[in-house]
């Protein structure tokens, strides 16, 4: 996790101390560039140019760090684009470490995980839709079944009777019940997931997404071991609720935090409020797996709190992190136990009589 003494901040603090003279806490900008040259401070041409163009008369350690990690100090167009993708979900204090991490990238185009997952999902959908021979692209569950009479599940779909084929607990994320379903998921996961992956790295966002998908099928089977499952909604919900975790983790450093909370609250209210209304008031037989959504939300919030970057970690936040890790581990373990002990086509724990 990033801290107030992250490795990049330590480097910039050391450089600033090398540039100081005597007991200075602020350095005159008029002398800063010449000091960098004479004292052989290893800054890039872009960073030196940004220092020369800075309007301030004096600069302290915080100002120095912001200048050398600013967009103006970055000459690479690709990396400036990456800054723009990451900045909306970061606090100002996160940007120093994240921009520095982006500067250290030696490959492109990032972020590879969300792009790769999306390409595979789109490719599989159109491959199976083409082989289905003329079925409606908007409603065809492409690849879900070997035959159109729905008697033989495809190799990716999660089917309760095939729970022994463990890959199905995750592979169902590659299938979608029509183009509308596919577009809804891939658009959101690209808009939400790419900034998260740029800011928080592939080895943080990848596990959140994949654990959410797996948790979605585990919870679905635990509650309703009669239903087939397709779609990446659990992973998408994990990305959305990882934003919630990010805001909570960096609450004091996060700009526009109340606006972020309001937007997320409205989304949650509309989605889950609609599901509750359909379940208890209209008695509609809803085919959407809200259980997978819930599992994704739990993963994004609790596991996200554990693994996402924290700019300044306070003692209480460290305690909360361990509590979240315990709660999520208990949730995950409980669903696994249910999968082991409950047989396919057992009675639903939450049954809607209209859907029997």
Curated annotation (Swiss-Prot):
Localization: Membrane
Catalytic center residues: 233, 293
Transmembrane segments: 107-129, 172-194, 201-223, 227-249, 256-275, 290-312, 319-341
Record-listed E.C. numbers: 3.4.21.105
A GO MF term: serine-type endopeptidase activity
Bilayer topology: Multi-pass membrane protein
SUPFAM superfamilies the UniProt entry points to: Rhomboid-like (SSF144091)
Record's function text: Serine protease which activates lin-3 isoform a in the proximal vulva precursor cells (VPC) during vulva development to transmit the inductive anchor cell signal to the distal VPCs.
UniProt name for this protein: Rhomboid-related protein 1
């Amino acid at each position: 996790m990033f801290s107030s003494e992250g490795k990049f901040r330590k480097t910039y603090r050391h450089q600033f101390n090398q540039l100081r003279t005597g007991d200075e806490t602020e350095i005159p900008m008029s002398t800063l560039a010449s000091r960098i040259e004479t004292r052989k401070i290893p800054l890039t041409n872009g960073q030196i140019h940004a220092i020369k163009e800075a309007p301030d008369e004096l600069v302290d350690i915080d100002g120095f760090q912001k200048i050398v990690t600013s967009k103006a100090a970055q000459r690479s167009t690709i990396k400036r684009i990456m800054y723009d993708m990451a900045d909306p979900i970061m606090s100002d204090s996160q940007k120093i470490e994240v921009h520095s991490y982006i500067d250290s990238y030696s490959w492109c185009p990032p972020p590879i995980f969300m792009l790769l997952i999306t390409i595979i999902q789109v490719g599989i959908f159109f491959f199976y839709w083409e082989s289905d021979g003329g079925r409606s692209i908007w409603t065809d569950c492409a690849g879900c079944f070997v035959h159109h009479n729905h008697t033989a599940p495809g190799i990716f779909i999660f089917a309760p009777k095939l729970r022994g084929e463990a890959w199905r607990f995750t592979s169902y994320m590659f299938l979608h019940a029509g183009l509308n379903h596919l577009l809804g998921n891939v658009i959101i996961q690209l808009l939400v997931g790419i900034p998260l992956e740029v800011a928080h790295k592939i080895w943080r966002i990848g596990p959140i997404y994949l654990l959410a998908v797996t948790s979605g099928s585990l919870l679905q089977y635990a509650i309703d071991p009669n239903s087939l499952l397709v779609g990446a909604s659990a992973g998408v919900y994990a990305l959305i609720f990882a934003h919630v975790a990010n805001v909570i983790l960096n609450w004091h450093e996060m700009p526009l935090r109340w606006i972020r909370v309001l937007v997320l609250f409205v989304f949650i209210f509309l989605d889950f409020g609609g599901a509750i209304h359909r379940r208890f008031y209209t008695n509609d037989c809803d085919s959407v797996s809200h259980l997978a959504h819930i599992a994704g939300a739990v993963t994004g919030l609790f596991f996200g709190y554990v693994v996402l970057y924290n700019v300044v970690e306070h003692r209480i936040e460290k305690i909360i992190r361990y509590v979240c890790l315990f709660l999520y581990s208990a949730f995950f373990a409980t669903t696994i136990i249910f999968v082991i002990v409950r047989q396919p086509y057992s009675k639903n724990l939450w049954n809607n009589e209209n859907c029997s």
